[in-house]
Structure formats: C-alpha cells, structure tokens
From Swiss-Prot:
Zn(2+) 1 binds at H348, C373, C376, C391. Changing R639M: No effect on MAP2K1 mediated-BRAF-KSR1 dimerization and BRAF activation. The active site is at D733. It comes from Homo sapiens (Human). Residues 1-172 are annotated as: Mediates association with membranes. The gene is KSR1. Residues 175-192, 557-570 have a biased composition (Basic and acidic residues). Keywords: ATP-binding, Cell membrane, Cell projection, Cytoplasm, Endoplasmic reticulum, Kinase, Membrane, Metal-binding, Nucleotide-binding, Phosphoprotein, Serine/threonine-protein kinase, Transferase, Zinc, Zinc-finger. GO terms for molecular function: 14-3-3 protein binding; ATP binding; MAP-kinase scaffold activity; protein kinase activity; protein serine kinase activity; protein serine/threonine kinase activity; zinc ion binding. Residues 444-473 have a biased composition (Low complexity). Belongs to the protein kinase superfamily. TKL Ser/Thr protein kinase family. Residues 1-26, 174-246, 265-295, 435-484, 557-592 are annotated as: Disordered. This is Kinase suppressor of Ras 1.
Length: 923
C-alpha cells in the first residue's frame, strides 16, 4: 500500500512540472477541434439544404399516394435525420466552453421540424430562442406543453416526442446513427396514418437501448393499463428482427418476410453451445439471466421447457448482448396463440398468362407474357420466378388450393421440405370436414402443394387448466372446440379492395396480439390488426367501443377473401378500373393504407414526355386540335388536344380516353403508341397512317372502283368496327375522312375522341350550333333530334347503332362516290335526317342494285333497334355477287345470271366517273 502511494505522489510531481506545456497544447488542440467540428457541420448543412429542397418538391409537387413517392420521402427523411445527428455529434465532441456561437447554431431547429413535416404556421409560433438542445433537455410533459402552446396538433406532438426519444437514444449511446434501426417504426406509423400521439405514447412503444429488456419494462410499467405497440415494420426498411433478452437472452432471427427459419427454430429449442466472444465491446460481468416468461412460450406450442445449462452458467460473461432485435411487447396475462391462416409459406403454383399490359411484380418492368401464382396472385416474367418472394396464401378458400395441371408448381423454385411455423393474424372459419393438423406434426415428405400441409387452420387458445385431459388438446382444434372465454368478432369486410377493418377495443376489456408485418413491393400485406375478447361493452366513460374510430386497417393486395368471390374468373381479376382515375376510394373513417391504382400503373407505361417527341409540320385540323407529323422512335402522328389540362375533370376524361386507346390492337385500327399526359401539353401519339383518306380516294376520278374493291374496303371497315364494339368502344365519329386506305389496307382512326369534344377550348360558342355538311350525313336520326345550341357533342346519345348508321353513309360513298345529301342547306339536311324522310328519298332515287340497297336500308333504319350489328353486316357483304372478268373485255363488268332461275337478274354493268349506272335489263 505504501509503495503504491509513493508511486502516485511521484506521478503527481511529474504532472506539475510539465503542466504549462500541456495546457498550451490542450488549448491549441481544442481550437483545432472546434474548427474541424464547425467545418464538418457546414458541409453537413449543405447536404441538409439539398435534401430539404428535394423533400419539399416531393411533398408539394408529387402524388403522395404513389408508393415510389412515399419511398423517396422516407429515404430523404432518414438522410436528414442522419445528417442532423452527425451535426449534433460533431458539436458535442467539442467542450461547451470552447464552442463558437456559429457552432452552437447547429443543428438548426427549423430543419429538424421540417424533417418531421411540422406545419409552417406551427414553426412560426415557436420562439426564436428555443433550440433542439433545449428541447432535448425538457421532459415529456414540458415538451408537450411547449408544442401545444405553439399550435401543434396531437399527431405532430407524437411524432416529435418519438423523434426526440430516438435522438436521445442515439446521443446516449454515443455511436453513429443507424438509418434503418430507429426510424422504421416511425415511418410505418406515419405511413399508416396511426402515428404515436402524446396521449397514447407510453414506455412500451418507445425503442429501448440494446441490452435492456422491453418485456421487463412493459411488465414493470405502472403508467396506465398494460398495452403493446402495434406497428407495421416494412421488410425493406427494418433490420433483421429477433426476440430480445426476455426469452432467456436467446435470439431468434427471422427472415425479412417475418417468418421463423428452421435454423432459428432449432436455436430456440436447443440450449446454446459455447457463446462467441463479443468484439469491440467491453465484456459485462457474469450474471444470471432472468427466468423465461411462461406467457411468451405460448407463441410456440408443444415446445419442451428450456433447462438452464451448467456450461452456459459459467460463460455468461462472453455472451453477445448487443444484437439488434425487434422488441416484442406482450401484455401479461394475455394468452397468445399460433395463427396459421396468414403468412403460410408454400410453393408457388404458376400458370402461364398473357396480358395486354401488365407490370412484373419482381423486376417492375412491363410484360405481355408471363406466369401468375394461383395462391398469392404474383405476376412476373418466367425468368423472374427465381427472384420471386416466398408464396403466401392470403385469405384463399380451401376449394381454391386444388392443384391444376397447367404448369408444374416447382418452376425454378426449389422445394423447401422443412416444416416452418408461422404467425397468423385473422381467424378463419373451417367446415366440420376440414380438420387442421397440429403444427408440430407437419408431414415434411408430402407434396408442397398438398392441402394437408398448407391448409390454413383456425386459431384457438391454449387451455390453462390443470386437468390432465386438457393437456392432450391439439393446438389448433376446430371452432366448435374453442374456449368460450375468447370471443372473436367477425371482421368488417369491405367489398372493394378486400379490406378488413377491426374495431379498436378498450385496454380494460380486451387483449392485443402483436402481428408481424411483411412488405413486398407490389403484392404486399400491410397488417396491423386487433382481436376482440368479448362483445363490445361500454367503456368507463360511457362511450361504446364500436363508436371509436377504426385506426388499424388490413389491406390485402389482389387477394380474394369471401367465398362467393372464389369463383370469379381470371379475366375479371385482371380488368382495368377506368372509373378509379385517379386512385380513389370511398371515404372511410380513420386512416386507410392505400395502394397505387392499377390504372395509374398502366397510364405510367403509356406516358411519353413531350420533350422526347419531335414535332413536325401540321397535316390536318380537326375539332379537337391540330394533327402534326412527328418522330418518336420512328414516324408518328401527333394529335395536339386544345383543352384545359389543369382542370382535373378534363384531365381525368382525357386519361379515360387514353385507356380506351391503350386496349386496342387490331390490323384495321390505328396503332396507339402513347400519350403526353402532363399539362399543358396533352397529345395522343399514334402510328403514322400512310396513303390517303377514303374521302379523297373515292372522289378521285382516276381511281377505279369495282364491286370487289368496294366489298374488300367495306369488309376491312367492318372488321375494325366490330373489334372496337367487342371491346366496348363506340367510335362516335365514323366517316370517310377518318378511314385511311393504302394498298388495299384500311385503317380506322380518331375513335372515341368525341368523349372529350365537350371540353375543347378552341372554337366554342355557347349560343351557336356549328355544323358541317360532311358531319351531318353521318349522324343517326336520334342524334340529330337531340342537337341544340349550347349542348356539347359528348352529351349526345351516341351508341353502337349510331356507328352502324355512319357505316351506311360510308357504304353509300363507296358506291356513289359522294354524300347522300348534297347541295342543301343545313336546316333542310337536319329535317330530312331527323325525320328519316331524306334517306328514304335517296334510296328510291338512286339505283345501286338490290344487294347494295338492302345493306343501305338496313344501316339507315330509322329505329336503332332494327339496325344490324357489324357481324350481320359481314354476312350481308358475303352475299354480294363476285366479279368474273372476261379476257376480251377487261374494262367492263359482266352480266350475271341466276343459275336456279331462268329470269335474268339485272347486275352492275359499269361505273362512270362518279355515277353508278344500272345495267340494262334487256341484256
């Protein structure tokens, strides 16, 4: 002891001798440290300014409901948090007395508030002298009072409280901020709309530093009723979750999809071997772990009780404690059960499919041919099946699990033979014949697609009675054997989009179950649900529980939940929802987790930036705007629409017409290539139609038209129009100027654009009716009678029968090379067409032959119910006589005779230049 005292005295004298030099060196080092910290904070501030600018653009100029936008916002917010934490760490590395005023100004409190989306009016009310450091030193009640005084809402207070707690955690650890560790649950809360408010924020919902048991804290907490925090943790943003030290300090790693691996299950059951040495951390003194919670092991039934290992007792000092884990908050006294109706991992059952336009759920690229899983409805390329996520049966009835013989179920998928337990969320009723097997007795040698090893089962609580007969009760009995103490209410099923809303129960009358949520890019589950334990009673304050807002919503993407919908065809499942433009839902109480509309995804595929289009000379002018020749990966036709693109109703109508164009693929219909959908440049881009319009072709005296050529042109038009009608598209503007003819090929253009004619800005007159003669003769009588000044064209009663009437006029033009009513005033034409008398006079005054007149009279029928369909018109065209030329008279027609009759039937003899002359009956 004396020797140690002498050595200490000698060291003290040595320090006094060199004290002056050390003090000077320390002063110089402190100044250099402050300078370096200030420089680092300045560089970080530049990055913060850039990130805030990008974040402001995403929040104000982009659709926040888009999944890609939300992902970018979360990424920028995480970057800003990391930069601000680094700024504060740089400032804290300098002693308080050596910091300059400029260094003390970092990090800026306004940047912190904008990161967590605090309203500008709240930021303006915050005092100038309030800093982030001062806010960190306040307790929770004082922070709440300060923010409330500035006008912050409960949601904003909850977000800032949660963020400050995470920042205190990072500062207390003294380590570098991890981007995905502390803020993932906050992002998930804010994304689902159920962020932690100051009223519900408790110690159980806050992240605890590594090494502390959240189970113990939840059990020892005396603030309010015991509860747990339920939040969705996206797999892409959260670390590998595991149980914390509450489970005898045994870590159970899980996959990103949230299910236990066979290796994790083995490590959970088997006592640990020699623990590994922990690196780069100080060893903790040996201590005995807390006894395992009996309530927790009810999550995994029929597992043997873990016994304490003697070798483990002696090597506790080498145990690894600092493992990032997902903390499970479990309420004491709450029975937990294994639920296998959701998250059941089975092998994909792919079948080949083809779509007009579809997005691969794996590579996010468009595809036409691919495969679709009959279990989880995953759609992807055949080559992408290797990278496809694990298959999940989601609310599928048992009848839909039967194997089909289309494609083997193991396409590019190795069969996992190991039986894996999974956690479920929702009760699913089974019939009496469907007896679910016990989870720990799964047959690993059975077929992966067999229903005996992959059928969802019904949950039931474990009996806690000491009766020996109850010990043999299977973990998943039928619903009839369910304990009467736990009453699971039926879920509120929303027919649209298969959403389940669960009422939020009171903490004093129910128990809560923690759910593991997995997030896939396109085929995702956002699971956040509660279960009831009793019928909804009245709470302590007199309010009924069913009057509380539904705050937790489950959304199953492309999953069918009800039995009546099990027989729905695949075509209905893949239909486009044009009425959902843009993505809209019926208003529900409480926040709802949205997914991007399927229509919005399709429109993104066909959107062409206007800057990529090379605009050429104008080639036409219509009532909707000018048509230009242009180039976009080749020669195209660009139709610029003169409409107010900033009007949301007009823009929605335009996108609906784009959807009509998108679903057309026919050789006689113009090829749609895309559309410019960003105002003010709205345009439809189609393939460039070579050749001439049918209007100019039939009026050219140099072209010869015989019966074979007119029949061929008419058949091509009927094929294209029949295809459009089969797709549910009404042309509304069929005329010879909208039909192109080139080398025997007919192409129909400008179909469906009448739907937006009422919103065109150019040439609009409210008190005038602008009509052109080349349009009147194509209109059906029911449309002409409805035309009045001030009534838009898109409000007229267009129908498929009206298209047939317009085809009759085109058929007349092919025969007579002119319009049926010419050289007449517009008023006279309106009366003759509207009354039907004008077309009758045309049919009686012109001799076009019996077969031609029959087609005209059928198409021009006054009653629209009497007009034939295009399929019947095709049969009528087939009955037209065939032209057999004589070698000696190549320029004239023949005289055909009826074989079955001795009477000579008059036929077409020859065409004049614009006039069709009838044949001589005497010949």
């Amino acid at each position: 002891m004396d020797r140690a005292a002498l050595r200490a005295a000698a060291m003290g004298e040595k320090k006094e001798g060199g004290g002056g030099g050390d003090a000077a060196a320390a002063e110089g080092g402190a100044g250099a440290a402050a300078s370096r910290a200030l420089q680092q904070c300045g560089q970080l501030q530049k990055l913060i300014d850039i990130s805030i600018g990008s974040l402001r653009g995403l929040r104000t100029k982009c659709a926040v409901s888009n999944d890609l936008t939300q992902q970018e916002i979360r990424t920028l917010e995480a970057k800003l948090v990391r930069y601000i934490c680094k700024q504060r760490q740089c400032k804290l590395s300098v002693a308080p007395g050596e910091r300059t005023p400029e260094l003390n100004s970092y990090p800026r409190f306004s940047d912190w508030l904008y990161t967590f989306n605090v309203r500008p009016e709240v930021v303006q009310e915050i005092p100038r002298d309030l800093t982030l450091d001062a806010l960190l030193e306040m307790n929770e009640a004082k922070v709440k009072e300060t923010l409330r005084r500035c006008g912050a809402s409960g949601d904003e207070c909850g977000r800032l409280q949660y963020a400050l707690t995470c920042l205190r955690k990072v500062t207390g650890l003294g380590g570098e901020h991890k981007e995905d560790s502390s803020w993932s649950s906050l992002d998930a809360r804010r994304e689902s709309g159920s962020g932690p408010s100051t009223d519900t924020l408790s110690a159980a919902s806050l992240p605890w530093p590594p090494g502390s048991s959240q189970l113990g804290r939840a059990g020892n907490s005396a603030q309010g009723p015991r509860s747990i925090s339920v939040s969705a943790l996206p797999a892409s943003d959260s670390p590998t979750p595991s149980f914390s030290e509450g489970l005898s300090d045994t870590c159970i790693p899980l996959h990103a999809s949230g299910r236990l691996t066979p290796r994790a299950l083995h490590s959970f059951i088997t006592p640990p071997t020699t623990p590994q040495l922990r690196r780069h951390t100080k060893l903790k003194p040996p201590r005995t772990p807390p006894p395992p919670s009996r309530k927790v092991f009810q999550l995994l039934p029929s597992f043997p009780t873990l016994t304490r290992s003697k070798s483990h007792e002696s090597q506790l000092g080498n145990r690894i404690d600092d493992v990032s884990s997902m903390r499970f908050d479990l309420s004491h006294g709450s029975p937990q059960m294994v639920r296998r109706d959701i998250g059941l991992s089975v092998t994909h059952r792919f079948s080949t499919k083809s779509w007009l336009s579809q997005v691969c759920h794996v590579c996010q690229k468009s595809m036409i041919f691919g495969v679709k899983c009959k279990h989880c409805r995953l759609k992807c390329h055949n080559k992408c099946t290797k990278e496809a996520p694990a298959c999940r049966i989601s609310f599928l009835p048992l009848t839909r699990l039967r194997r089909t013989e289309s494609v083997p179920s193991d396409i590019n998928n190795p069969v996992d033979r190991a039986a894996e337990p999974h956690f479920g969320t929702l009760p699913k009723a089974l019939t009496k014949k469907e007896h679910p097997p016990a989870m720990n007795h799964l047959d690993s040698s059975s077929n992966p697609s067999s229903t005996t090893s992959s059928t969802p089962s019904s949950p039931a609580p474990f009996p806690t009675s000491s009766n020996p007969s109850s010990a043999t009760t299977p973990p998943n009995p039928s619903p009839g054997q369910r304990d009467s103490r736990f009453n699971f209410p039926a879920a509120y099923f929303i027919h649209h989009r298969q959403q389940f809303i669960f009422p939020v129960p009171s903490a004093g009358h129910c128990w809560k179950c923690l759910l593991i949520a997995e997030s896939l890019k396109e085929n995702a589950f956002n699971i956040s649900a509660f279960a009831h334990a009793a019928p909804l009673p009245e709470a302590a304050d007199g309010t009924r529980l069913d009057d509380q807002p539904k705050a937790d919503v489950l959304e199953a993407h492309e999953a069918e939940a009800e039995e009546p919908e099990a027989g729905k065809s695949e075509a209905e499942d893949d239909e486009d929802e044009v009425d959902d433009l843009p993505s809209s839902r019926r208003p529900w109480r409480g926040p709802i987790s949205r997914k991007a509309s399927q229509t919005s995804v399709y429109l993104q595929e066909w959107d062409i930036p206007f800057e990529q289009v090379e605009l050429g000379e104008p080639i036409g002018q219509g009532r909707w705007g000018r048509v230009h020749r242009g180039r976009w990966h080749g020669e195209v036709a660009i139709r610029l629409l003169e409409m107010d693109g900033h009007n949301q109703d007009h823009l929605k109508l335009f996108k609906k017409e784009v959807m009509n164009y998108r679903q057309t693929r026919h050789e006689n219909v113009v090829l749609f290539m895309g559309a410019c959908m960003n105002p003010p440049h709205l345009a439809i881009i189609t393939s460039f139609c070579k050749g001439r319009t049918l209007h100019s072709f039939v009026r050219d005296p140099k072209t010869s038209l015989d019966i074979n050529k007119t029949r061929q042109i008419a058949q091509e038009i009927i094929k294209g129009m029949g295809y459009l009608h089969a797709k549910g598209i009404v042309h509304k503007d069929l005329k010879s100027k909208n039909v192109f003819y080139d080398n025997g090929k007919v192409v129909i253009t400008d179909f469906g654009l009448f739907g937006i004619s009422g919103v065109v800005r150019e040439g609009r007159r409210e008190n005038q009716l602008k009509l052109s003669h080349d349009w009147l003769c194509y209109l059906a009588p029911e449309i002409v009678r409805e035309m009045t000044p001030g009534k838009d064209e898109d409000q007229l009663p267009f129908s498929k029968a009206a298209d047939v009437y317009a085809f009759g006029t085109v058929w007349y033009e092919l025969q007579a090379r002119d319009w049926p009513l010419k050289n007449q005033a517009a008023e006279a034409s309106i009366w003759q067409i509207g009354s039907g008398e004008g077309m009758k006079r045309v049919l009686t005054s012109v001799s076009l032959g019996k077969e031609v007149s029959e087609i005209l009279s059928a198409c021009w029928a006054f009653d629209l119910q009497e007009r034939p369909s295009f399929s019947l018109l095709m049969d009528m065209l087939e009955k037209l006589p065939k032209l057999n030329r004589r070698l000696s008279h190549p320029g004239h027609f023949w005289k055909s005779a009826d074989i079955n009759s001795s009477k000579v039937v008059p036929r077409f003899e020859r065409f004049g230049l614009g006039v069709l002359e009838s044949s001589n009956p005497k010949m």
